[in-house]
Amino acid sequence: MSTMTPAEIVSELDKHIIGQAKAKKAVAVALRNRWRRQQVGEPLRQEITPKNILMIGPTGVGKTEIARRLAKLADAPFVKIEATKFTEVGYVGRDVDSIVRDLIEISVKQTREAEMRKVRTKATDQAEDRILDVLLPQPRAVGFGGNADHANDDNNATRQTFRKRLREGQLDDKEVELDLEQPSAGMDIMAPPGMEEMTEQIRSMFSNLGSGKKQRRKVKIKEALKLLTDEEAAKMLNDEEVKTKAVQNVEQNGIVFLDEIDKITSRNNEGSGGEVSRQGVQRDLLPLVEGTTVNTKYGMVKTDHILFIASGAFHLAKPSDLIPELQGRFPIRVELDSLSVEDFEAILDATDASLVKQYQALLATEDVQLEFAADGIRRLAEIAYAVNEKTENIGARRLYTVIEKLLEEVSFSAGNHAGERVTIDAKYVEHALGEVSQDEDLSRYVL
């Protein structure tokens, strides 16, 4: 669990997301409250439930990114789902319990990886021993007393020499023949609506049939070391312990991001055709958000302390169009701001993995030095903002389209410009995008 203070969390989020201070503050406090709850003694700890968050704002302003980065900071099981994918029980589509099943699968994978990291050093040593046994088979004991001891000393010295060469990568390209565990054969089964759990159990049953069998394979030592390390680490894990920790991790630290929640609201001016199913999804979500117990193949999972972050643009609907019970389960409401030209400018250049840095790194692989002048970045931001205003406002995602169109020619002919420097200034941007951005009909289709 993260022990970062709210200010530290916001500072980390600032490295990747521009603006949206209110939303960052809300999620930072929610994450810190989880740590605070763990410091409270029982039985009061069980009574403290997370305060779920409703983010309201247009597309492309950072709602999903805030939740995703938060989960990464907390090292918590995180699942993003779209509310429109779910239907009321009895209708065709996924039922809401599958959210928890997806979350527990992610948690098991995370927990297994964390446990394997703990035993990685020991597993690597054992994997090296297995490779050395193939490269240097133990000599048969011949003779008596001193001769056998002398042979063992020589063999140990040779093993140490080979182990050193193995660790330095000098033997990476040499091939060895090994008995490796055969991966269980995957089996795809089409799941009827609402039968995902039964399908998962059948798939698990069939996958276990082939497990444990050994297969003789010829592989390079570099790959063999990785495969054997994973195999040895897996042997050291206690599967029941992994499952228990994974369930506990979901119950205490799980984060569910419910996107497009505004699309399942009831609107008074519509016919009653789709209303039943929409309200049904809200009513099915209600016990999950309130706190219930869901049966999964890893055991019963309580959702009382899972943090739910819902988001929606709410262009046509209002948060008050949600059923009252569900509204009450999202006490923290945060409105995200639309992005300005200055925000676009910062997104292009100021974040840790900005678009400018990404494209510079990509073209550097072909020895093309890409430089963005300040006026070029400003003009790019202005064009992206203008196209959003004229056509559909898709927020920061517009920058991907604009910069891709801008660098289309450079990317295509990068091989012919090795060792050259390409400077993107306002004049270059205007030449590449000016005509398209001015023509509204053209920008509607191209940008």
UniProtKB/Swiss-Prot annotation:
Give an example GO cellular component term for this record. HslUV protease complex
- Coiled coil (residue ranges): none
Question: What InterPro entries does this protein's entry cite?
Answer: AAA+_ATPase (IPR003593), ATP-dep_Clp_protease_ClpX (IPR050052), ATPase_AAA_core (IPR003959), Clp_ATPase_C (IPR019489), HslU (IPR004491), P-loop_NTPase (IPR027417)
What do we know about how this protein assembles, alone or with others?
A: A double ring-shaped homohexamer of HslV is capped on each side by a ring-shaped HslU homohexamer. The assembly of the HslU/HslV complex is dependent on binding of ATP.
Q: Please give the Gene Ontology molecular function terms for this protein.
A: ATP binding; ATP hydrolysis activity; peptidase activity; proteasome-activating activity
**Role summary:** ATPase subunit of a proteasome-like degradation complex; this subunit has chaperone activity. The binding of ATP and its subsequent hydrolysis by HslU are essential for unfolding of protein substrates subsequently hydrolyzed by HslV. HslU recognizes the N-terminal part of its protein substrates and unfolds these before they are guided to HslV for hydrolysis.
Q: What is this protein called?
A: ATP-dependent protease ATPase subunit HslU
Q: Which GO terms describe its biological process?
A: protein unfolding; proteolysis involved in protein catabolic process
* HAMAP family from the UniProt entry: HslU
Signal peptide, first to last residue? none
As for subcellular location, the record says: Cytoplasm
Q: Where does ATP bind?
A: 18, 60-65, 259, 325, 397
Q: Belongs to which family?
A: Belongs to the ClpX chaperone family. HslU subfamily.
**Keywords of the record:** ATP-binding, Chaperone, Cytoplasm, Nucleotide-binding, Stress response
